Amino acid sequence: MAKKVEKVVKLQIPAGKANPAPPVGPALGQAGVNIMGFCKEFNARTQEDAGLIIPVEISVYEDRSFTFITKTPPAPVLLKKAAGVEKGSGEPNKTKVATVTKDQVREIANQKMQDLNAADEEAAMRIIEGTARSMGITVQ
């Protein structure tokens, strides 16, 4: 018989840098999870993505055991990395902060494809282009 999921905790944590301090500690402590066990496992699984923020979905079971799924980094994080900027524009329609190429957008779309609600690569690219526009990043 399958274990019953008691709680699902969603967090965004920098890759390889999970520690018991907030926000990880309080969120998992309330669910009764072994915080250090999660931190060690998460850091081991995400060490090659250092510097990126990784969304994680932690399923906590009745017996206080847990499993977690790491997702792809958020599109804005990948776009900022590709464009080489710290943050998006405060006024995206007036002030453009950077430019990315169609090839960079295609690469990001392919990386995010499993998490996007898109039927094909073109639809995924349009989603990423829309995110870029809302950040003040021009797509060429």
Curated annotation (Swiss-Prot):
InterPro entries: Ribosomal_uL11, Ribosomal_uL11_bac-typ, Ribosomal_uL11_C, Ribosomal_uL11_C_sf, Ribosomal_uL11_N, Ribosomal_uL11_N_sf. It holds the Pfam family Ribosomal_L11_N. Coiled coil: none annotated. One of its GO terms (biological process) is translation. Keywords: Methylation, Ribonucleoprotein, Ribosomal protein, RNA-binding, rRNA-binding. GO terms for cellular component: cytosolic large ribosomal subunit. The keyword Calcium does not apply. GO terms for molecular function: large ribosomal subunit rRNA binding; structural constituent of ribosome. One or more lysine residues are methylated. The keyword Transport does not apply. SUPFAM superfamilies: Ribosomal L11/L12e N-terminal domain (SSF54747), Ribosomal protein L11, C-terminal domain (SSF46906). Forms part of the ribosomal stalk which helps the ribosome interact with GTP-bound translation factors. Belongs to the universal ribosomal protein uL11 family. PANTHER family: 60S RIBOSOMAL PROTEIN L12 (PTHR11661), LARGE RIBOSOMAL SUBUNIT PROTEIN UL11M (PTHR11661:SF1). Part of the ribosomal stalk of the 50S ribosomal subunit. Interacts with L10 and the large rRNA to form the base of the stalk. L10 forms an elongated spine to which L12 dimers bind in a sequential fashion forming a multimeric L10(L12)X complex. This is Large ribosomal subunit protein uL11. The lineage of its organism: Bacteria, Bacillati, Bacillota, Bacilli, Bacillales.
